[in-house]
């Protein structure tokens, strides 16, 4: 059980970091396109 946590925690953290970094510029561009109207 502990080994699974040690293995999956960095993977989940990396995926979450990538998703966050992809979402942030996409959200800014979304606001730029649709927020002005």
Swiss-Prot record:
Annotated localization: Cellular thylakoid membrane
Q: Does the keyword Signal apply?
A: no
Question: Does the keyword Metal-binding belong to this entry?
Answer: no
- GO CC annotation: what is one? plasma membrane-derived thylakoid membrane
Per the record, the major location class is membrane
Q: Which residues cross the membrane?
A: 4-22
A Pfam family annotated for this chain is PsbY
Gene Ontology BP terms: photosynthesis
Q: Which UniProt keywords apply?
A: Membrane, Photosynthesis, Photosystem II, Thylakoid, Transmembrane, Transmembrane helix
| Recorded superkingdom | Bacteria
The membrane topology term of the UniProt record is: Single-pass membrane protein
GO MF terms here are: manganese ion binding
Its biological purpose: Loosely associated component of the core of photosystem II (PSII), it is not always seen in crystals. PSII is a light-driven water plastoquinone oxidoreductase, using light energy to abstract electrons from H(2)O, generating a proton gradient subsequently used for ATP formation.
Subunit info?
PSII is composed of 1 copy each of membrane proteins PsbA, PsbB, PsbC, PsbD, PsbE, PsbF, PsbH, PsbI, PsbJ, PsbK, PsbL, PsbM, PsbT, PsbX, PsbY, Psb30/Ycf12, peripheral proteins PsbO, CyanoQ (PsbQ), PsbU, PsbV and a large number of cofactors. It forms dimeric complexes.
Q: Which family does it belong to?
A: Belongs to the PsbY family.
What's the protein name? Photosystem II reaction center protein Y
Lineage at the top is: Bacteria, Bacillati, Cyanobacteriota, Cyanophyceae, Synechococcales
Gene name, Swiss-Prot/TrEMBL: psbY
């Amino acid at each position: 059980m502990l080994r699974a946590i040690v293995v999956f925690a960095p993977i989940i953290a990396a995926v979450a970091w990538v998703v966050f970094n992809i979402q942030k510029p996409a959200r800014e561009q979304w606001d730029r396109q649709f927020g002005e109207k």
